[in-house]
Curated annotation (Swiss-Prot):
Zinc finger (C3H1-type): 205-232, 234-261, 262-285
Gene3D superfamilies: Zinc finger, CCCH-type
Pfam families documented for this protein: zf-CCCH (PF00642), zf-CCCH_9 (PF22623), zf_CCCH_4 (PF18345)
Gene name linked to the record: Zc3h8
A Gene Ontology term for the protein's cellular component: histone locus body
Modified residues (Phosphothreonine): T33
Keywords annotated in UniProt: Apoptosis, Isopeptide bond, Metal-binding, Nucleus, Phosphoprotein, Repeat, Repressor, RNA-binding, Transcription, Transcription regulation, Ubl conjugation, Zinc, Zinc-finger
Annotated coiled-coil segments of the chain: none
Region listing for Disordered, in residue ranges: 1-191
Keyword Zinc-finger: yes
Name recorded for this polypeptide: Zinc finger CCCH domain-containing protein 8
PANTHER family found in the cross-reference section: ZINC FINGER CCCH DOMAIN-CONTAINING PROTEI, ZINC FINGER CCCH DOMAIN-CONTAINING PROTEIN 8
Amino acid sequence: MDFENLFSKPPNPALGKKPAADPEERIDEIDGTEVEETQTEKVKWKVKRDREQIPKKFKHLGNAATSPKSLLRKKSRSKDYDPYSDGETCSQGSEDNFDKELQQYIQAKEMANAAQPSLLPEESVKKAGAEGTQQTAKQKNKKSKAGHKKVKQKKMKRKWPGTGDKGSRALLKNSGSREQTDEPEEKQPRVRMSQGFINQHTVERKGKQVCKYFLERKCIKGDQCKFDHDAEIEKKKEMCKYYVQGYCTKGENCLYLHSEYPCKFYHTGTKCYQGDHCNFSHAPLTAETQELLAKVLDTDKKSCK
């Protein structure tokens, strides 16, 4: 019975319905399908058995989709492969080709390494260090050149005495003579200052222009100051407010009065409870201390009002 024609072509409606088949014919059709199924199962079993008989080497090297029937056909075409078995032909040929390719690869790699030898790690480190030292040397040379240029410019600005425009020979002679005699160089003359500048930064004491910043203990130039520091520093006629509170850090260098200030309790006739341990003076009053005491009493009267 043709199954393809039965399922592919639909029934023609013009012809009408076919008469129902007899039960005997239907039994024959069922028997035929069972026979075909058993035959297909036998064929599948034979194919599976043939695959199990093929060696593992051949399975790995060959294509998995090829069936043993196609392999047998290829084998039967050539007579040269008759005396050899399947496993021997495949394994020997593949192993020989692999060994040859491996040897060729090793030889090519050795030739390349011999032609272009790679640097050792020590040599590479030395090379990197040499490059770094070259860069640092270049930077130092640039800095030294810039410094030499500045020194030359300064030397050109200076004029040695007696040289004039005679050139470099006169400079060399003068420098040689100075080195031989070891005479001290003359001090550079002080810069001339205007009278207004002097009056702004000095105070006249005993016919001298004394640095006013020195008198205030604020001069930061010290011995390099252009004005005189030869004077006694007079303290201001005021009481140090930090001394009264007990934490003046300047001590004797403070510009304000500390223990020299007169004690208002002792000099007004009241009892000073501090006694000899008083932080202010119990000495006899002078003209200056009398003025200071009067100022203190005036401030107290104003505060009481």
